[in-house]
Amino acid sequence: MGEQSLAGKKVAILAADMFERVELEQPRKALDEAGAKIEIVSIHDGQIQGFDHFDPKNKVRVDKTVEEVSADDYDALFIPGGVGNPDQLRGDENAVNLVREFATSGKPIAAICHAPWVLVEAGVARGRTLTSWPTLQTDVRNAGGTWVDKEVVVDDGIVTSRKPDDIPAFNKKMLEEFAEGTHARRDVAELAGRTAGAA
């Protein structure tokens, strides 16, 4: 498959302080090179602090807060990892609701490393196959999802990966899914039924 064009597509990057720098910067670069219009969305305005593991690195300017946006404003959602970043996001009702809006509207979502924690919190993991940083596998399973140890997993428009080493494969699948666009709409209740039916 050739290079994916995201010209005319608008992508929200949902992140908070303590995001893993490489997991935001490299996918953002891939999105930018594909022609996407990108906005950093966070739980507060100003800047958010990036980290290389536990070492503070660069800050990123926030374009909009979660209170100012909805899934209707974007074509796709990307959530970078880092331990503190998704932990803050999943504790913020507006951030969780935004992720849920993307999922129920069928718009593609990409999440790497610890970011699937936010998918768990939003009820998006239920009935889906995901990967993540390995320590999240129990959380994914307890939320009704199936966890697998693969560099990248795509389940109906949801792209997940485990760690920074997976970024090349993650970026490729993210661009493919974001270019494909909206998948079938479904609500969280339907996802719950899908899991019950599979049991």
Model-derived segments and their meaning:
Residues 1-105, 109, 117-129, 137-199:
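Extended, subdomain-level signal for the structured scaffold at the beginning of enzyme domains
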